[in-house]
Amino acid sequence: MKASMFLALAGLVLLFVVGYASESEEKEFPIELLSKIFAVDVFKGEERGCKGFGDSCTPGKNECCPNHACSNKHKWCKAYLGK
């Protein structure tokens, strides 16, 4: 009887330790995933080689991405509609 109680108690302690270890790993996973998704280096405009919508530009230098044009009035890239 004492052996079975000891074995049951040891099993519960082992289950608690394994559950705690897996829970701590699960808590770190979303943080790592979000830090990789929202990393600042990934979304830099300089890596594209062209400027997107709303980026400042100099008219006549063709700095904007395709389907965008530099506005003479506002000096930022706007969607080019063909006119």
UniProtKB/Swiss-Prot annotation:
Residues 22-48 form a propeptide. One of its GO terms (cellular component) is extracellular region. The modification Leucine amide is found at residue 81. Disulfide bonds join 50-65, 57-70, 64-77. GO terms for molecular function: ion channel inhibitor activity; sodium channel regulator activity; toxin activity. Monomer. Belongs to the neurotoxin 10 (Hwtx-1) family. 15 (Hntx-3) subfamily. This is Mu-theraphotoxin-Hhn2o.
